[in-house]
Amino acid sequence: MAEEPIRLTQYSHGAGUGCKISPKVLGTILHSELEKFYDPNLLVGNETADDAAVYDLGNGTAIISTTDFFMPIVDDPFDFGRIAATNAISDIFAMGGKPIMGIAILGFPTNVLPAEVAQKIVDGGRFACHQAGIALAGGHSIDSPEPIFGLAVTGVIDTEKVKRNASAKSGCKLYMTKPLGIGILTTAEKKGKLKPEHQGLATAAMCQMNSIGSQFSQVDGVTAMTDVTGFGLLGHLIEICEGSNLSAVVFSDKIKTLDGVKDYIAQGCVPGGTGRNFESYGHKVGALTEEQKAILCDPQTSGGLLVAVEPNSVQTIIEIAKDTGIDLYEVGKLKPKSESDIVVEVK
């Protein structure tokens, strides 16, 4: 009798970027009464919830540093490692940089799962690093109750090309590089409701590198970028708005989703992270239908880039996306800060 295949998602209480601590709770954790340490060379710290830290070397080049890790969102160990690494590397691309090195972070229940499973996870991470043109240069591991994997990633960028999430301008159009719905499809799979024709769609999206961010950083009209991950499209857009002192409008009819997403919402395949996200920032968002909430607050794992671009540079980024095979689509626009508490309106 054949052995049952190991299903990694059965060994974790959370999944992918849905494991993130909610924005509301995270704000409490990060609050500190200690005097802030000031370093004039630290161009980007944690003040605006940006994707990575950026340090000016003083010679026209800056170092980008980030880390990201989570528990399994798929059952296959190799795919889990690949997705986790792709997601971590994305933070470098979201700042407009070029990754140069990855360091692995591994937590593994050695008394529950065989070491060969961990080997496949790390190999998946190594594969993603090679796709990004970097080495998996080392790492650290611990024995933990649940599988955890991710990377610490170092990148470089011309100092003047850094794309912060707090440098957007009013009038910019907003574009996305991947469809939404990753959290919904992976939840449907975990519940055993995913149809055969939708198998692998979420994995393919999560494994798509956001390397186009390095090219977007060369476009002066691109004023801000971030990758859409655990806080959903609305959460990460709110970070851009609050960091840049702006408001935004999202065009719900232009949002692209993975196939089957709306049907799975109707079947109740909405991850727990969606509710936690809305609880954290729902008061900053205009009226939403339940379906809009499920899509726009859906926690993405290794999601796409959200790009703020001035109208006169829109055609440039469309051409870049076309040349690299990325299905770029408009999702909204930025406008002057509203006098009300509503940061993002959904139309």
From Swiss-Prot:
Which cofactor is recorded for it? Mg(2+)
**Looking at the keywords, is Phosphoprotein present?**
no
What EC number(s) does the entry state? 2.7.9.3
Binding residues for Mg(2+): D51, D91, D227
Active-site residue list: U17
Q: Give the main EC class.
A: transferase
Q: Where are the transmembrane segments?
A: none
**Keyword list, A-Z:** ATP-binding, Kinase, Magnesium, Metal-binding, Nucleotide-binding, Selenium, Selenocysteine, Transferase
What do the Gene Ontology cellular component annotations say?
cytoplasm
- Point out the annotated site residues (description: Important for catalytic activity): K20
- GO biological-process terms attached to the record: selenocysteine biosynthetic process
Q: GO molecular-function annotation terms?
A: ATP binding; magnesium ion binding; selenide, water dikinase activity
User: Any idea which positions bind ATP?
Assistant: K20, T48, A49, D50, D68, D91, G139, H140, S141
What detail does the entry give on cofactor binding? Binds 1 Mg(2+) ion per monomer.
| Substrates-to-products reaction catalysed | hydrogenselenide + ATP + H2O = selenophosphate + AMP + phosphate + 2 H(+)
Question: Which InterPro entries would you find in this protein's record?
Answer: PurM-like_C_dom (IPR010918), PurM-like_C_sf (IPR036676), PurM-like_N (IPR016188), PurM-like_N_sf (IPR036921), SelD_I (IPR023061), SPS/SelD (IPR004536)
Which Pfam families did the record assign? AIRS, AIRS_C
Q: Does the keyword Phosphoprotein apply?
A: no
Q: Which domain of life is it from?
A: Bacteria
User: Main role?
Assistant: Synthesizes selenophosphate from selenide and ATP.
- Assembly notes: Homodimer.
Q: Do you know which PANTHER family this protein is assigned to?
A: INACTIVE SELENIDE, WATER DIKINASE-LIKE PROTEIN-RELATED, SELENIDE, WATER DIKINASE
What family does this belong to?
Belongs to the selenophosphate synthase 1 family. Class I subfamily.
Protein name listed in UniProt = Selenide, water dikinase
The scientific name of the source species is Haemophilus influenzae (strain 86-028NP)
